[in-house]
A protein has these predicted regions:
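Conserved NTP-donor binding/palm subdomain of two-metal-ion nucleotidyltransferases/polymerases, i.e.
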Residues: 6-181
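RNA/tRNA-interacting regions in translation and RNA-turnover enzymes
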Residues: 2-4
Length: 181
């Protein structure tokens, strides 16, 4: 799917979708959904659910602060692309949410590794490690990184004091057994 955030113009975006005659689904608290050319698009009111727990509230506020500085975001055809720090924090939270509810796929681990490798030269490691620590995602991000390094055969730029090798093995087994179902 494609995730969009319209910088506070959530309702305006929904109205534009309706005006274009596209079926708009408002079944979700965090975002609306619509489909264009077979691709699901999520128009986010929030980046993550800030009301679910303290982690959600922290991550939502951290992401808002990261998106406020437009200078850190590249643009493509006039659209802002998330900064390395934004993308990393959002991905860690999003993946942890899905892992806890329905597992994640091997593709998600590969996406994590490819993303970190792509941002190798521009990610502010101290900022992202601080955010991960503050919202309780350090261990999960370390596990994702450990698995991604094993699968992709690369050393990623995000280094943790603890790699949780045994837990990473169990998580990978969960993922692989889930994919077999």
């Amino acid at each position: 799917d494609i995730d969009i955030y319209l910088m506070g113009d959530y309702d305006k975006g929904n109205e534009a979708v309706k005006k274009a005659g596209i079926d708009l689904r408002l079944d979700f608290f965090v975002h609306s959904e619509f489909t264009v050319d077979g691709i699901n698009v999520e128009n986010h009111l929030y980046f993550v659910n800030p009301n679910v727990n303290r982690t959600g509230e922290y991550v939502q506020q951290a992401l808002l602060s990261l998106v406020d500085n437009y200078d850190n975001h590249p643009t493509v055809a006039g659209a802002l692309i998330p900064s390395a720090e934004f993308a990393t924090l959002f991905f860690a939270r999003h993946a942890s949410w899905h892992y806890a509810r329905e597992c994640i796929k091997l593709r998600d681990i590969c996406d994590w590794g490819v993303m970190l490798n792509h941002y190798r030269d521009c990610i502010d490691i101290n900022t992202i490690l601080s955010h991960l620590e503050n919202c309780g995602l350090t261990r999960f991000a370390s596990i994702l990184t450990t698995i991604a390094e094993q699968i992709l055969g690369v050393t990623l730029p995000l280094h943790f004091s603890e790699r949780y090798e045994a837990l990473a093995t169990r998580v990978l087994e969960d993922i692989l057994s889930f994919e077999d179902e």
